[in-house]
Amino acid sequence: FGGGYLAADAGNSSWLNTVVTIVWIVGICNSINFFDNLDGAASGAVAIAALGVFFIAFDRGQELVSALSIVTAGATIGFLMWNKSPAKIYMGDAGALFLGVIISVATIRLNPGITPTWQSLAIPVMLLAVPLLDTCVAVFSRLARGLSPLTGGKDHLSHRLVRAGLT
């Protein structure tokens, strides 16, 4: 768990690296799963993030990370053709959580070569900013109304944009 570049930014403490890595993986898995609330949302976000990881990893000579990310991008773009509105197939929890694991591990293993290394944390966060922001908005909205953050609802950013007529 603690061997990635993302976790290495937590310092020299192996237990802290492990905790940061687990929190990142679980957080991204849930963000992608939460973001799978509208046709094409999760697959589109993962495709964009995977392409971003690919370009950085390829430029830095990280063959395995670039291969994993380009395959993920290709698979999600192929899936997106069937999942765009009106969707003919759906990803479901199994697909969204699987993509969450893949993209979270790819961002952990990504070494953008930025110093100081704590600044390299911004790259995975920027690549996954939309699902992360959507999750934060939905969770805080539910908590503010006294609801469990794990209950379903129409308080995601995508639902708000649809209600406002912006999508």
Regions found by a protein language model. Give the residues of each.
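"…together with the soluble PPM/PP2C metallo-phosphatase catalytic core" -> "…together
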Residues: 1-136
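A helix-boundary/kink motif common to multi-pass secondary transporters
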Residues: 36, 166-167
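Cytosolic, membrane-interface loops and tails of multi-pass inner-membrane proteins
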Residues: 137-166
